[in-house]
């Protein structure tokens, strides 16, 4: 099963260059990478505004503004000296075939994880997290979920491919333990009986960052963690370019501080999703996503340097 392309493959959406100007590596399974970046240009499960398939391209493009900083503030070290990161480009699948995308993404992830790599993925709409969770659970067992979002995505509507149902499905499949999982920034209707700890946007905006992080760490414990960041967790003032924006969200400053504070968790996989550049202004949504992705890599590099 072919899941990745090459430089001549015209089915690819965003493979001009890699994240942070990293060279493309279309054979990441045999590389010496610690973390592999994969773009998933998919938005067929979107319920609002489409366009998330162009998210990986937008994140990579704007990341050129971040590539110049060797000793990134406030970390004061070069992530690339501690962590070997490669960008393998985008998942290749038949556009219009959601099932093929899901199967190929899971197969790609399983192959990477079996080769000892870890994954940072760029959506695409949030549905892409479900096949990633399936692959990670095969490798790491049941996981805790740390989920930044405006929506809980725990809705049971009977639709197989929907970006609002993944975290209803994942506990039922035994992929994640909701009692050790936390959802941050929520500000839409949700089922309060699904087992997740919900730190809604009002709490997150009013409480101190250290207080929130202490609660997250207590809930998660020492379980393997999958970290997923839906960019609509941010207020539309900071991230207008997304499919289902909701006012009253987090500032980019608060989000970055919270992500940095997750360094001590046992994070085994990560993604940033729901960037839809057609609705962006001055690339600020893509820049927020790229910056958060870079911070995710820095927390891994910081841990490796200890």
Curated annotation (Swiss-Prot):
It catalyses: agmatine + H2O = urea + putrescine. The keyword Hydrolase applies. Gene3D superfamilies: Ureohydrolase domain (3.40.800.10). It is an enzyme of class 3 (hydrolase). Its EC number is 3.5.3.11. GO terms for molecular function: agmatinase activity; manganese ion binding. Pfam families: Arginase (PF00491). The keyword Manganese applies. Mn(2+) binds at residues 126, 149, 151, 153, 230, 232. CDD domains: Agmatinase_PAH. Pathway: Amine and polyamine biosynthesis; putrescine biosynthesis via agmatine pathway; putrescine from agmatine: step 1/1. Keywords: Hydrolase, Manganese, Metal-binding, Polyamine biosynthesis, Putrescine biosynthesis, Spermidine biosynthesis. Its cofactor is Mn(2+). Catalyzes the formation of putrescine from agmatine. HAMAP family: SpeB (MF_01418). This is Agmatinase. It comes from Salmonella typhimurium (strain LT2 / SGSC1412 / ATCC 700720).
């Amino acid at each position: 099963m072919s899941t990745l392309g090459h430089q001549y493959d015209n089915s690819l959406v965003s493979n001009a260059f890699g994240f942070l100007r990293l060279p493309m590596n279309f054979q990441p399974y045999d590389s010496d990478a610690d973390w592999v970046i994969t773009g998933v240009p998919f938005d067929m499960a979107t319920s609002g505004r489409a366009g998330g398939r162009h998210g990986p391209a937008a994140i990579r493009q704007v990341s050129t503004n971040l590539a110049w900083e060797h000793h990134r503030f406030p970390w004061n070290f070069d992530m690339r000296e501690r962590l070997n990161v490669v960008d393998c480009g985008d998942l290749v699948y038949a556009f219009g075939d959601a099932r093929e995308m899901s199967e190929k993404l899971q197969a790609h992830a399983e192959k990477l994880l079996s080769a000892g790599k870890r994954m940072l993925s760029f959506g695409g709409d949030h549905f892409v997290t479900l096949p990633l969770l399936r692959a990670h659970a095969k490798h790491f067992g049941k996981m805790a979920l740390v989920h930044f979002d405006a929506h809980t995505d725990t809705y049971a509507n009977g639709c197989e491919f929907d970006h609002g149902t993944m975290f209803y499905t994942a506990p039922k499949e035994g992929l994640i333990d909701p009692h050790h999982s936390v959802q941050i920034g929520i500000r839409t209707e949700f089922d309060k009986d699904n087992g997740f700890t919900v730190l809604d946007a009002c709490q997150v905006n009013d409480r101190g960052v250290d207080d929130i992080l202490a609660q997250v760490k207590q809930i998660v414990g020492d379980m393997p963690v999958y970290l997923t960041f839906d960019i609509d967790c941010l207020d539309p003032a900071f991230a207008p370019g997304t499919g289902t924006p909701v006012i009253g969200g987090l500032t980019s400053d608060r989000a970055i501080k919270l992500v940095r504070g997750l360094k001590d968790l046992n994070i085994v996989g990560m993604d940033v999703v729901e960037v839809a550049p057609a609705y962006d202004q001055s690339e600020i949504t893509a820049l927020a996503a790229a910056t958060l992705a870079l911070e995710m890599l820095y927390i891994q590099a910081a841990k490796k340097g200890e």
